[in-house]
């Protein structure tokens, strides 16, 4: 049984700790992202999500408003729970929540995640770039009628 909750870090510190644990495992430990880059000044302004699988937090994400629209960020699923469709469930929930805001929806995708986001209506924009020593493309959600 899957459950997805949304929260603010400053309102639900117990959920913030669970989200940070997933991000630590995926980004800092697996991908060697510098913790100073992983945890930033936007933690308390972003809306965060946790996906629970049988009451265990296994995936997280966040979104925030920027000058360029709504930026989806920090999508991470624990290694043990990948390729089970959980990322798609989480992405769909986030998109359901932000789509009514009528703003551009975009993200910075690691190269290996591009096919996942393309399956969900995102397209690559511009040139490849490095963020936290990992190659990325900016991607934008195309309007779906």
Question: What annotation goes with each model-predicted range?
Answer:
Residues 1-43, 48, 52-53:
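Short amphipathic alpha-helix that is part of the acyltransferase structural core
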Residues 23, 117, 122:
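Conserved active-site tyrosine of GNAT-family acetyltransferases
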Residues 50, 56-64, 71-76:
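Conserved beta-strand in the GNAT
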Residues 65-73, 82, 101, 132-136:
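A conserved beta-turn-beta hairpin within the catalytic core of GNAT-like acetyltransferases
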Residues 97-110:
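Conserved GNAT acetyl-CoA-binding A-motif
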Residues 123-138:
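Conserved catalytic-core motifs of GNAT/GCN5-like acyltransferases
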């Amino acid at each position: 049984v899957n459950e997805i909750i949304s929260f603010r870090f400053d309102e639900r510190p117990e959920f913030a700790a669970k989200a940070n644990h997933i991000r630590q495992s995926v980004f800092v430990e697996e991908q060697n992202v510098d913790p100073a880059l992983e945890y930033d000044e936007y933690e308390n302004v972003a809306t965060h999500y946790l996906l629970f699988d049988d009451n265990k937090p296994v995936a997280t994400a966040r979104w925030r408003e920027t000058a360029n629209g709504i930026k989806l960020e920090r999508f991470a699923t624990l290694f043990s729970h990948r390729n089970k469709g959980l990322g798609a469930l989480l992405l769909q929930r986030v998109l359901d929540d932000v789509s009514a805001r009528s703003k551009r929806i975009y993200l910075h995708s690691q190269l290996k995640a591009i096919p996942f986001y393309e399956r969900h209506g995102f397209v690559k924009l511009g040139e490849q770039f490095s963020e936290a020593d990992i190659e990325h493309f900016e991607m934008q959600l195309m309007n779906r009628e």
